[in-house]
Structures are given as structure tokens and as C-alpha cells.
UniProtKB/Swiss-Prot annotation:
Protein origin, superkingdom: Viruses
HAMAP family registered for this protein in UniProt: HBV_X
Name the record gives this protein: Protein X
Family listed: Belongs to the orthohepadnavirus protein X family.
Modified how: A fraction may be phosphorylated in insect cells and HepG2 cells, a human hepatoblastoma cell line. Phosphorylated in vitro by host protein kinase C or mitogen-activated protein kinase. N-acetylated in insect cells.
GO terms of biological process kind: DNA-templated transcription; symbiont-mediated activation of host NF-kappaB cascade; symbiont-mediated arrest of host cell cycle during G2/M transition; viral genome replication
Record gene name: X
InterPro entries, sorted: Transactivation_prot_X
Function: Multifunctional protein that plays a role in silencing host antiviral defenses and promoting viral transcription. Does not seem to be essential for HBV infection. May be directly involved in development of cirrhosis and liver cancer (hepatocellular carcinoma). Most of cytosolic activities involve modulation of cytosolic calcium. The effect on apoptosis is controversial depending on the cell types in which the studies have been conducted. May induce apoptosis by localizing in mitochondria and causing loss of mitochondrial membrane potential.
GO cellular component: host cell mitochondrion; host cell nucleus
Subunit structure: May form homodimer. May interact with host CEBPA, CFLAR, CREB1, DDB1, E4F1, HBXIP, HSPD1/HSP60, NFKBIA, POLR2E and SMAD4. Interacts with host SMC5-SMC6 complex and induces its degradation. Interacts with host TRPC4AP; leading to prevent ubiquitination of TRPC4AP. Interacts with host PLSCR1; this interaction promotes ubiquitination and degradation of HBx and impairs HBx-mediated cell proliferation.
Pfam family, one: X
Length: 154
């Protein structure tokens, strides 16, 4: 069964922040383009970084109050909506890395919501794991085959 998560991009750090749906009633609200979201309070984030929650495949930083720096999740149809169809996400992330005009933060949030999480949650198919790296910290995984360094199979 797929974990249900809130998804929000933090434009100041250029990272994708995730929150387990069960945490919406805890912690302080976090305002953003998608409305008001909740971030877990310190008491809602256990010392083991949520290992007991069985949110399969999420990096350790997914449970930090700042949100994760990399997102690993199970997606449908071998990621055809994000990788194979039009190569949209790698191009967008590459442009953002170079500081060039690219998809806006709001559009990128909608892209994840509509193209990725819709397939993942509604279809429930579990074929491959992918990691999307929008920012950087010691948890990120960048070992993708050429030509794209913005995602990797796990």
C-alpha cells in the first residue's frame, strides 16, 4: 500500500518537502502555493526519524522538520509520465540548476501532483523506485546513468 503524503516545493531551498498525511493535525502550519500545510512538531517526529511508520523508500531526511532533500517513491508504469514520455523533469531541473528560466515552482508542484502522485496513489502500481533530487544534502543519491544526473533508480 502506498504512503499518502503532502508534497510542497520550498523555493528558498529548491527542495521538495513531504509530509505524511497523518501529520496534518499536528505541528505548526506551513504556508505555500498549495495552501496551508502542516509540518510535524518535534514530538511528532520520533528520534528514529519515523522508521516505524513504514513509509517505504523515503530517505531519512523525509522526517526532518525541514522536509527531505531527495524524494524516493514508487511510481506507476516505470516512470513513463516523468522520464520516458517527454523528458520534462530532467530538463526542468537542469535549467533550474543552471539558473535559467524554467518551470515555475507552482507549476512544478502541480506537475508532481498531477503526473506523479496521481499515478502512484490512484493506480497503486509498484514497478520501480526512483529518486528525484531537487536540492542537496548528505542524504541525496546521485548515481544515475548518463545523460541525466537528476534521477536514479534504486
Amino acid at each position: 500500500m502506498a504512503a499518502r503524503l503532502y508534497c510542497q516545493l520550498d523555493p528558498s531551498r529548491d527542495v521538495l518537502c513531504l509530509r505524511p498525511v497523518g501529520a496534518e493535525s499536528r505541528g505548526r502550519p506551513l504556508s505555500g502555493p498549495l495552501g496551508t500545510l502542516s509540518s510535524p512538531s518535534p514530538s511528532a517526529v520520533p528520534a528514529d526519524h519515523g522508521a516505524h511508520l513504514s513509509l517505504r523508500g523515503l530517505p531519512v531526511c523525509a522526517f526532518s522538520s525541514a522536509g527531505p532533500c531527495a524524494l524516493r517513491f514508487t511510481s506507476a508504469r516505470c516512470m513513463e509520465t516523468t522520464v520516458n514520455a517527454h523528458q520534462i523533469l530532467p530538463k526542468v531541473l537542469h535549467k533550474r540548476t543552471l539558473g535559467l528560466p524554467a518551470m515555475s515552482t507552482t507549476d512544478l508542484e502541480a506537475y508532481f501532483k498531477d503526473s506523479v502522485f496521481k499515478d502512484w496513489e490512484e493506480l497503486g502500481e509498484e514497478i520501480r523506485l526512483k529518486v528525484f533530487v531537487l536540492g542537496g544534502c548528505r542524504h541525496k543519491l546521485v548515481c544515475a546513468p548518463a545523460p541525466c544526473n537528476f534521477f536514479t533508480s534504486a
